[in-house]
Every structure is written in C-alpha cells, then in structure tokens.
C-alpha cells in the first residue's frame, strides 16, 4: 500500500487538465515510465489528433480482457495550490484522486500482483490496459481506439470510481446538441419590425424540446447554456441553446435524435440549425450481468465484502464497449466522493481489497 500511495502522489501532482494536450502528453510519458517500473514493460504511446493515450498489451494473441482508464482530469493548472495532494485520517485527497487516478494506479498494481504471482508475463497474455487522455471531453479521439481494442474481448473492466462502492451495472447514454436559430438583426428602437428575433423563436422552441423527455423511461432532455444577440439595442440575429440528453435505452436515444433533427422554425424568416448528436450509447444492464455475478463469487473466494450493484445516470467509456455488446463491468476503481468537486477524495482502506478483486477478475477471464 505505501507504494500505491507514492504512485498516486506522483500522478496526482502532475496536473493533466483535458484541454491542455501538452500537459496530458507529459503526464502520459511519466505514467508510461511508472508502468514500466511496476510491470517491467513500457506501454505504447499513441497520439490521435493531438491527444496522447497509452496502450499496454500482453501477448500477441486475441485480446481477452481490457482495463479502461483515463489520466486526464477536469481540474485546471494551479488547482494543487488550493487542493494539494494529502493523506490524512484514512482519506486521500487531490485533484483527480477520485476521478479517476486511483483507479488507474489500481490497474497497474493489480497487473503487477498477477505478474508477481505467476512469475511469467505469459500468464497475462490477452490483457490490454488502456489509459486515455480525453475522457472528460467526451473521448472524441479515443472512442474508436477503445472500441477497436475491446472488439471480441471476454470482459472490459472500467476503473471509474464509485461514491458508495457499488459496481455500475448500467449507465445512461449521452447525446449533446446545439440548436441555433438564425434570424435577422435590426435596431430594437428604430425599426424592430424589420428584424427576425432569433431569441424569441428559440424561447418558443425550448419548452418543446424539453417535452421530448420521458420520465417513465428515464429519458432526460435538458436545455442548458443559452446565448442570444450581440447588444441590448439590437434584435438578435442568432440565438443558441445547448441540449443535454440522457437515455437508458438505445431506442429512446434514437427517438430523441430523430426528433431533435426534425425541429423547425415557425417564425417567418427564421431558420433552425441542429448540430451534435449521440456521443455515448446506453450501457444496458445485460452487458454487466454475468460479470457482476462473477465478481460477487470471487469476492467471497478471496474473503472481501461482496460488492453491490447499481445503475447511474452518468456515462463513461464503458458505454462504448457495452453498446457494442462487449461484456462490461464499471465502477471498479476508488471508493470515495467528490467527482469534479472540491471535496474530491478516495477512502484509502478500500483500495487494497478492490485491487485484489480486480486482480481476481482479470485472472478469472484470462484463464482458458
């Protein structure tokens, strides 16, 4: 455990905000060196559209197990000055400690445990560790890498954290849209009748968009950020709203996508432009069921508390693999709280048993 805490301090104090590709690249290089120190093999450093990711494959045969991690965080440079890395009273704190650097270090140490037990890296043939650099931005450069690497795998284990320790058996899919109304500017005092008020038309559309939601099916459609106009005395020629969509079911996600693209203007002279679309497909419960059952069995075998399962609204990279029909179990990382919040922390006593469970899950799926 002391080595894990040392490694966590090392990665947390790097600062890897998602938007800073250079910082993410530097963090990836340091993490690659750490991986080589712990498991004796350096991962590949992959750059996709300017974003750096790491991939460590064991063996040359088919991929059987994929560990999904990310090393980018939502925290800007300088956060450590306010929220420094600390270990006190059984709590680990620092930016990214919960989401999800603890899970990433757990992946590395679970792999090291298995190597030490086997004494030979061939025991891990079929294992891939992925550590991406843009998860907090929607995985725009890494989603295809994830899907390609996991294709045909027996299991994908996602090292995202869990506030209550429950493993994630289902997650909502996410879609993001930008609805822009194009109108015509005019002087608001001299000749407003010559304008086409994009703000008014957007105000008419937003309740209609929100009504696409279906509470019974768990589908949420939420207009969020809104912009309109340029100056207080000008009829707005352009107005835009961002729409956040979450859906438990693929059919619902597709329904919303169809309805969003059918949005039309009614105000004469106004036009509507809808951009964006589906980002992550729903992670439906069937994808995790047998892996969760096996996790419960293995927990009993190694003498730790049986995990519980839950469904959540937030998405992860596991949505991509679950959406492709690959068995996927999520939430295997840190136990704590405060994702994207200043009280972010991980409970230290939970790290060793969950690392042991991860090692058991990996070995179980690698066994022929």
Protein language model regions, located:
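Acidic/His- and Gly-rich active-site-bordering loop/insert found
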Residues: 1-95, 116-121
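A structural signal for isolated positions on well-ordered beta-strands in alpha/beta enzyme cores
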Residues: 44, 66, 128-130, 273
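Metal-dependent amide/peptide-bond hydrolase catalytic core
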Residues: 16, 75, 161-162, 166-169, ...
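Acidic/histidine-rich catalytic neighborhood of metal-dependent amide-processing enzymes
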Residues: 100-101, 105-172, 214, 366-367
